[in-house]
Amino acid sequence: MFHDVIKKRHAEKASKAGVDGLILVAAGAGGHGGTINPMPFISEVRSFFKKTILLSGCISSGRDIASAIQMGADLAYMGTRFINTKESMAEEEYKDMIINSKASDIIYTASVSGVAANFLKPSLEAMGITEETWSKKGKIDFGKE
């Protein structure tokens, strides 16, 4: 069993529970990603965890995979990179949004669900979520319906 973690304390708890591997969700990962730079994160976790470590977050090329392995990860974990494949069933509009977005379009906010996550600015805007809203902590008022 592999368990995803965003902090060292989560990795320690998962390790004590006997997991087979850890997926380190570092800064830049899509969705509910972590905020820790992958270099110190891998080093910290590798100091006590000797089983399989996967690194996720901002990995989209062979060079990124090689870097993850050089830093001490056993494997790399990619998700967003595969959304734009022909095999993906994602809508073309969504695929285009990913291709046309820049690093500056990544917004880390807890305003959507109360739990911090990375979103692409165009997707927030498409849902009617403004910068004023995503800058606030808490939940968005979706109304009474």
For each predicted feature, which ranges?
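Short loop or secondary-structure boundary microenvironments that flank
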Residues: 28, 57-58
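Conserved active-site-proximal phosphate/metal-binding subdomains
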Residues: 16, 35-54, 60-145
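Active-site entrance/lid segments in N-terminal catalytic domains of soluble metabolic enzymes
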Residues: 1-52
